Amino acid sequence: MLDINALKEIPPATAVGAAVAVGALYFFCQCFYNLYLHPLRKIPGPKLAAIGPYLEFYHEVLRDGQYLWEIEKMHQKYGPIVRVNAREVHVKDTSYYNTIYTAGARKTNKDPATVGAFDVPTATAATVDHDLHRARRGYLNPYFSKRAVAGLEPTIHERITKLLSRFDQHRKDDQVLSLDGAFSALTADVITARFYGEHKDYLDVPDFHFVVRDGFQGLSRVYHLGRFLPSVVGALKGLPKFLIRIIFPPIAELLTMREEIEAGGIDEFTKSKSSGIKSSVLVGALSDPHIPPQERTVARMLDEGTVFLFAGTETTSRTLGITMFYLLSNPDILNKLREELKSLPPSDDNMHSLGQLENLPYLTGVVHEGLRLSFGPISRSSRVATHEALQYKEHTIPAGTPVSQSTYFVHTDTEIFPDPWEFKPERWIKAAEDGVALKKYITNFSQGSRQCIGYSMSFAEMFLTLSRIIPAFDLELYDTTKADIDMTHARIVGYPKKVPGKTESLGELRVKVIKKL
């Protein structure tokens, strides 16, 4: 029988020593198992990665999103398949992408390790289980179909008109314009119009610093910490906000944004119930009596709203900004695009339908090159084949193993995209003429059964926005170089390092509006 009194007599130093010894033994056993007994022991890769999450933690958390480039070095040394941590395999082979991100009947879960940092457990995008994800996506699909997006075109055009008025005001005032901020405000207004049924006038914010943009930037800074230590981030969230702002400001920004989403959602829900109008995703999908009650809770509304605003704001706005950088850096490309846009029938304020614009080959090439070189989310989003092993060449990947491939490697594959770091709209025109389906290699929105639900809306925003800005204004880059877009940190999406002398830590694209055209 255990003698409690005897335990009390153990000297503290002895107790600490015993605890350290037990911890060391556990660590040694875990490392031994992962290296020599684990089902992935035959997959190539560095032993330091195989023993646990330690190498990844160092490069992602302590070095701020650097593991992507370490994985690139692993592939250079070990080949196209590597074990990037104790439990996950990464494949750098574009031809294998659709095997990982499949659209077939194979049950494919999301890796739980990739969703915890977002703290949106009931959102469709964070749903781990294959069947539950399919059901939740089915509730939302009608609101993001091509037909639904076509119905949103007047709203997008109205917001672009507001954006152009901000451009013109900066021209009159001879002020420098933040393209990052302007495009973030535009895309945030569009997605809030879709989600809530009305936009939130973020384009009216004088400096374009609004709560959604600041909230996403806050999330990007804590994303990797949240993946590895979700309890630490959760504990910080429980503190008073004034204290959080002192200890860790990014979490305060994130909490402020979620509070606004919740308040806006409840307000819209209340108005819609009294009017009977179902004009938004929130009201239409999440109050549908055909949807199970547990799927129509306030908590789920908040989770879905958070993801919609993040995904619908930052990725599209960064793509627009990077596309504009390349256009303004390459006058020949810019002039070719202007000439093509002149071929469109005359219209008020250069407003044309998405259908008209998608028939323009050079604009289509510009949009796809912008998508390719902005990458979208580049952090690994692993998939898990739950019931069957996958085969990659001579390597068998056991069922239940998280497997990933980053968009970064697909979009810079020299066999698919020669001169991958060059902005070449012509490559898309030539591919179309040669019957090459190059578009299938654009993976910003992922592919398969978990492809981003908002991809049609993002395309619409890009086509419509570029088609109206380019003919309307002569813009000039201001104190902005390629260092402002070169990706050096993988935090959900890719960000450049902070440029000395700039105020923004996540990149800053600035222009002068020279004249109206």
Curated annotation (Swiss-Prot):
Major place of residence: membrane
Entry-linked Pfam families: p450
InterPro entries to which the protein is assigned, alphabetical: Cyt_P450 (IPR001128), Cyt_P450_CS (IPR017972), Cyt_P450_E_grp-I (IPR002401), Cyt_P450_sf (IPR036396), Cytochrome_P450_monoxygenase (IPR050121)
Pathway named in the protein's UniProt entry: Sesquiterpene biosynthesis; trichothecene biosynthesis
Gene Ontology molecular function terms on file: heme binding; iron ion binding; monooxygenase activity; oxidoreductase activity, acting on paired donors, with incorporation or reduction of molecular oxygen
Required co-factors: heme
Membrane topology label: Single-pass membrane protein
CDD domains given in the database record: CYP58-like (cd11062)
Result of knocking out the encoding gene: Impairs the production of harzianum A and leads to the production of a larger quantity of the aspinolides B and C, as well as other secondary metabolites including additional aspinolides and their degradation products, gamma-lactones, and hemi-ketals.
Name of the protein in question: Cytochrome P450 monooxygenase TRI4
Species assigned in the record: Trichoderma arundinaceum
